[in-house]
Design a protein with these regions (language model features):
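Residues lining hydrophobic/aromatic ligand-binding pockets adjacent to catalytic sites
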Residues: 1-136
Length: 136
């Protein structure tokens, strides 16, 4: 199971493995509050600054953040979260006050909608696309 929560909220025993997904360490948070810091899964700082500065809309930010999860340096941390989620609960943490406009909700949805998750839910492999973009 994969959950998402704000790092400044009080801890709970149901959080399982606590994964911080921010590029910068949050102020006032002790290192003992998280089990793993996977900063590669946080948005790159120029993207975050552009969104917070009003230069990007939420849909633009979403597209760019999700595209960033395809980067080679994000693959090992993504695999680490997926592996931990197979064994129990993983809670993704960041400091954003609004979860509906936060990368932690985007990452959670991305992980839950991964090809492996879709295969488990449907019981079959996803359809492959042809060179023209149609399904086989």
């Amino acid at each position: 199971m994969i959950a998402a929560k704000r790092i400044y909220d009080p801890p709970s025993s149901s959080e399982g493995m606590r994964v911080l997904i921010m590029r910068l360490w949050p102020r006032g948070i002790r290192k003992t509050r998280v089990d793993v810091w996977l900063k590669e899964l946080g948005p790159v700082l120029p993207l975050l600054r552009a969104f917070r500065g009003g230069k990007l809309t939420w849909p633009q930010y979403t597209r760019r953040y999700l595209a960033g999860l395809e980067r080679p340096e994000a693959q090992a941390p993504l695999a680490q979260v997926r592996a931990a989620a197979k064994d129990g609960t993983v809670t993704l943490f960041c400091g954003c006050p609004d979860e509906t406009r936060c990368h932690r909700s985007l990452l959670r949805a991305y992980l839950l909608d991964s090809p492996a998750s879709r295969r488990r839910k449907s019981g079959r492999a996803p359809r492959r696309r042809t060179a023209r973009g149609g399904a086989r």
